């Protein structure tokens, strides 16, 4: 995974400006909670999982010279807190190749992060507001 720091800055209402190296985007919540100027944080998490899965499958198939013409991944949350990945593989693939690609799909770094034993450390920095 990337060693870049992801910086998030407060915007208008609940909107947040995200900077990742030279890339930028906005996260927000839908109306009426906020202005719906970008995907929600949960949707960004699903996007990370889907794109990581697709990249891992593509890289593996290409490395082995397999005839994978296209890979699409749709990811959604289930009400019970489960994440479901639907993977569409288009190509001239043997059943054993499909099985191997599905195994690879479950081993992408984001998938492993979400299903592993993860700890998050919060390091506070408190800056007092200037008094007027």
Enumerate the language-model features and the residues they cover.
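Extended beta-strand/beta-hairpin segments
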Residues: 1-47, 55-132
């Amino acid at each position: 995974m990337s060693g870049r720091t992801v910086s998030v800055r407060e915007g208008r209402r609940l909107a947040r400006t995200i900077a990742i190296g030279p890339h930028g985007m906005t996260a927000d919540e839908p109306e009426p909670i906020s202005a719906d100027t970008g995907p929600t944080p949960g949707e960004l998490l699903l996007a990370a999982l889907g794109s990581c899965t697709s990249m891992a499958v593509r890289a593996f198939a290409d490395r082995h010279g397999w005839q994978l013409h296209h890979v699409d991944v749709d990811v959604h949350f289930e009400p019970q807190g489960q994440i479901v990945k639907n993977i569409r593989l288009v190509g001239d693939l043997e059943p054993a190749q499909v099985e191997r690609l599905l195994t690879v799909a479950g081993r992408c770094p984001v998938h492993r992060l979400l299903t592993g034993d993860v700890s998050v450390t919060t390091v506070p920095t408190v800056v007092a507001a200037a008094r007027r």
